[in-house]
């Protein structure tokens, strides 16, 4: 490996030229000669920075509208040359050793995501020379420092000046470079798969034969699902959508844990379904209470009072701005782990700062971005499915009992059905006036989920006569209907589809319960 004081030449070829002038100036201060391609070189020259254009060095012009400029033996030889053993051949062909390579690529991902761009426009933004330079530099990391992220530049220059640019630092930059080229190739490959009409005709384009996902670490977490498990949080590369836990900003509180993030995601995705002010409280992966009201304070109080025992230590999410009165009410009412809001008032911030342990996540504007693929890791495998983004479609629903639902019952049916989608199976949700009353979650039989909801109702002394029941899947037997009727349920919404549907409908008619079949199931495991 060459000594740091032998670093003499740098090649710069960047598509994103932000801060490149400052970078070049620091290289010049360190008496490092600059080589660059046309566009980058012109910017440096305009800023009075001495630079040698690649075409002047190679004595070969950029051709084909700039598509061929760095792929030349004098460039590749300068990067791949090993100074210990290639000096003679480099001298013979007048090849200048290149010690630092600074490159970023054509913005393929950005261009492909602009809908008005046709395939020719997109393909023209596939970088060829850039990835070649980076791969060659990373391969020869013992002799060449490769930088693909300008955030690494200052620390690199400092290491060069301090003569501490050791093999570990070089290897780390090379590793980052290969990650960069790998991700670039991946998004290009995925684009071609999506555009391949022949592939679309013969394969399932949503689920190709081979898939690759690229994530970057956002942060280390306090611990995993249990205290003895270490954990980190990774997010999709180049993701910019607001309104997700992945893009949320934590403005106060302790370091998030694995369970905090998992529960927060459920709470946020559930509350995003509602247009009126809504509150969702989640505990151990399940909504324990949900409420919709005319303002944020009432929605919180309704949700909290629905199940105050389960709300203790829960995750609270809202779909509207958190004000000071609601913030004060929350800290007066309960112990809370995380509060999630799209925005927060300055006075509410000051109130919550009195309880510094409360984690507060601000998501920005909420939007319906829960589309695409849903992933679940298993041992040595990955389950991939479409996200359960089923929207309410009244036209597909069937009103199967003698009595049709009243306006209130229909409204509550819609509300309970929206909540049931986020409750672990077997899921039973009782609700009235857009407030959950009792939730039975995660039982191995549907009747026991129903009994659990009944126990919650009875323990809290609630009168639920006239309330609605939602079931995430069909009832295999009439016992669930009878159990619900025993506490006063007057309307039921469920997918239908059981071989005993006729028996189930008769049971509902016997109890004068109205029943809706949605023809869609919402299992959650």
From Swiss-Prot:
Reaction equation(s) it catalyzes: (6R)-10-formyltetrahydrofolate + 5-amino-1-(5-phospho-beta-D-ribosyl)imidazole-4-carboxamide = 5-formamido-1-(5-phospho-D-ribosyl)imidazole-4-carboxamide + (6S)-5,6,7,8-tetrahydrofolate; IMP + H2O = 5-formamido-1-(5-phospho-D-ribosyl)imidazole-4-carboxamide
UniProt xrefs under PROSITE patterns: MGS
One Pfam entry name: AICARFT_IMPCHas
Domain MGS-like: 1-148
Coiled coil: none
Keyword hit for Hydrolase: yes
EC number: 2.1.2.3, 3.5.4.10
GO BP terms: 'de novo' IMP biosynthetic process
One MF term in the entry's GO annotations: phosphoribosylaminoimidazolecarboxamide formyltransferase activity
Key words, A-Z: Hydrolase, Multifunctional enzyme, Purine biosynthesis, Transferase
GO CC entries: cytosol
CDD domains named among the record's database cross-references: IMPCH
Keyword Flavoprotein annotated: no
Pathway: Purine metabolism; IMP biosynthesis via de novo pathway; 5-formamido-1-(5-phospho-D-ribosyl)imidazole-4-carboxamide from 5-amino-1-(5-phospho-D-ribosyl)imidazole-4-carboxamide (10-formyl THF route): step 1/1; Purine metabolism; IMP biosynthesis via de novo pathway; IMP from 5-formamido-1-(5-phospho-D-ribosyl)imidazole-4-carboxamide: step 1/1
InterPro entries, alphabetized: AICAR_Tfase_dup_dom_sf, Cytidine_deaminase-like, MGS-like_dom, MGS-like_dom_sf, PurH-like
SUPFAM superfamilies: Cytidine deaminase-like, Methylglyoxal synthase-like
SMART domains, alphabetized: AICARFT_IMPCHas, MGS
Domain of life, per lineage: Bacteria
Domain notes: The IMP cyclohydrolase activity resides in the N-terminal region.
PANTHER family referenced in this protein's UniProt entry, alphabetically: BIFUNCTIONAL PURINE BIOSYNTHESIS PROTEIN ATIC, BIFUNCTIONAL PURINE BIOSYNTHESIS PROTEIN PURH
Similarity comment: Belongs to the PurH family.
Protein name per its UniProtKB record: Bifunctional purine biosynthesis protein PurH
Organism, as annotated: Buchnera aphidicola subsp. Acyrthosiphon pisum (strain 5A)
Gene that this sequence comes from: purH
